[in-house]
Swiss-Prot record:
InterPro entries: A-D-PHexomutase_a/b/a-I, A-D-PHexomutase_a/b/a-I/II/III, A-D-PHexomutase_a/b/a-II, A-D-PHexomutase_a/b/a-III, A-D-PHexomutase_C, A-D-PHexomutase_C_sf, A-D-PHexomutase_CS, Alpha-D-phosphohexomutase_SF
Name recorded for this polypeptide: Phosphoglucosamine mutase
Organism this protein belongs to: Burkholderia pseudomallei (strain 668)
GO BP annotation list: carbohydrate metabolic process; peptidoglycan biosynthetic process; UDP-N-acetylglucosamine biosynthetic process
Gene that this sequence comes from: glmM
PANTHER family tied to this protein: PHOSPHOGLUCOMUTASE (ALPHA-D-GLUCOSE-1,6-BISPHOSPHATE-DEPENDENT) (PTHR42946:SF1), PHOSPHOHEXOSE MUTASE (PTHR42946)
Length: 452
């Protein structure tokens, strides 16, 4: 039986619509608390579980925080409140403080009217599927509030921001500083607005912060990693050396250089791998996704680095890294994983890794990416009849085979069905845009004819 509420990145939706309602979130807190309290060894030790709750800057965060806190308390679980805190900050603090679990109230890069709940285990990793399944099972049980002397207690973690700032700084080499660098830091009016500027300033940079005036409604609105034009303009206007774009919960990173050129997660992954090769002499492998640009795969293989594609989603990149014992992975959207630095994607830490790579090499981003030109992509969404058997179509298979044969070694074809609507996504990459367009349109035409 599939999970009813948990997706690949927790539970998410529009506030006020199921399941993102205060009554459901209260029951979710209670269910999670009961699962934590029943963990092996917990009852025998007599120790009360403690969870950390952090959130981004959405107006609904206060309501959902109160609901979660009430649910955990009713289950006899103590709560520590971090206030606005990046998702990776909650993961770090949960691990560092030896807590039972961490919870983030955020919908990441989504608009303010959405929100979500994401859990971290005691080691700062996302919850295993089996624990999420146990929480869902508890949601069906009646809420049996603990007796008054068994209720969980709640308190603020007053030094949460300071602890996380120091952790981020600790990932930057002690031999380097950022003196003499002018950085524009875009916090997306989100969870990092209180911490990110301080991290770079305390390392010596001249910081120009933007997206640091949250009002509950403006998170990700025209700023941040999902809207980098604001950062590109600010970098040029302020003659900055570099621009750093985070998203609403600060687990994504995009970078802008002094010319206003934008670098995505695919390109930054290549930069970090090349830096590791220069530092350590070898990188066994790196992980991208089905959407990672083919040019990056080619460049990494030419550098002697194995490259594996995971399903789309940082959760799947992480799974592949752990399975292979590798350190570096990324999505083009800016989720960058460096498992020797953090257990999860962290936009601030990733920015510091990029800055350290530039310091070590003495090069600009453009210079580090010389010879790597992203292949043009053509994406066509083809609407089909619900239930259409596109996989069984010989005409579609022939169109795909023809494109793959023509592009052999110089491009690729990716066909993906949408998980939410009867749409087939046809994506073709090639060295020349004309080739990408021609092959994508040929496949799309075959799909239309076969599924009409």
């Amino acid at each position: 039986m599939g999970r009813r509420y948990f997706g690949t990145d927790g539970i998410r939706g529009k506030v006020g619509d199921a399941p993102i309602t205060p009554d459901f979130v209260l029951r979710l807190g209670y269910a999670a608390g009961k699962v934590l309290a029943s963990a092996p060894g917990r009852a025998a030790s007599g120790a009360r579980p403690t969870v950390l709750i952090g959130k981004d800057t959405r107006v609904s965060g206060y309501m959902l925080e109160a609901a979660l806190e009430a649910g955990f308390s009713a289950a006899g679980v103590d709560v520590m409140l971090a206030g606005p805190m990046p998702t990776p900050g909650v993961a770090y603090l949960t691990r560092a403080l030896r807590l039972s679990a961490g919870v983030v109230i955020s919908a990441s890069h989504n608009p303010y009217h959405d929100n979500g709940i994401k859990f971290f285990s005691a080691d700062g990793n996302k919850l295993p599927d089996e624990i999420e399944a146990k929480i869902e099972a508890w949601l069906d049980k009646p809420l049996d509030c603990a007796a008054s002397d068994g209720l969980g207690k709640a308190r603020r973690l007053d030094d949460a921001a300071g602890r996380y700032i120091e952790f981020c700084k600790s990932t930057f080499p002690a031999a380097f500083d950022l003196r003499g660098m002018k950085l524009v830091v875009d916090c997306a009016h989100g969870a990092a607005y209180q911490v990110a500027p301080h991290v770079f300033h305390e390392l010596g940079a001249d910081v120009i912060p933007i997206g640091v005036a949250p009002n509950g409604f403006n998170i990700n609105d025209g700023v941040g990693a999902t809207a980098p034009d604001a950062l590109m303009r600010a970098v040029r206007a302020n003659h900055a050396d570099l621009g750093i774009a985070l998203d609403g919960d600060a687990d994504r990173l995009l970078v802008v250089d002094h010319t206003g050129r934008l670098y995505n997660g695919d390109e930054l992954l290549y930069v970090l791998v090349k830096d590791r090769i220069a530092t350590n002499g070898q990188v066994e492998g790196a992980v991208g996704t089905l959407m990672t640009n083919f040019a990056v795969e080619v460049a990494l293989k030419e550098a002697g680095v194995q490259f594996v594609r995971a399903a789309v989603g940082d959760r799947y990149v992480l799974e592949q890294l752990r399975e292979r014992g590798w350190q570096l992975g990324a999505e083009g959207s800016g989720h960058i994983l460096s498992l020797d630095r953090h257990s999860t994607g962290d936009g601030i830490v990733s920015a510091l890794l990029v800055l350290a790579a530039l310091k070590r090499s003495g090069k600009t981003l453009a210079q580090m990416l010389e010879g790597v030109t992203l292949f043009p992509q053509k994406l066509i969404n083809v609407r089909m009849k619900p239930g259409a058997d596109w996989k069984g179509s010989e005409a579609i298979r022939r169109a795909i085979d023809s494109a793959e044969q023509a592009l052999s070694g110089s491009g690729r074809v990716l066909i993906r069905a949408s998980g939410t609507e009867p749409v087939l996504r046809v994506m073709v990459e090639a060295r020349q845009a004309t080739d990408a367009n021609r092959h994508a349109e040929a496949i799309a035409d075959a799909v239309k004819q076969a599924t009409a």
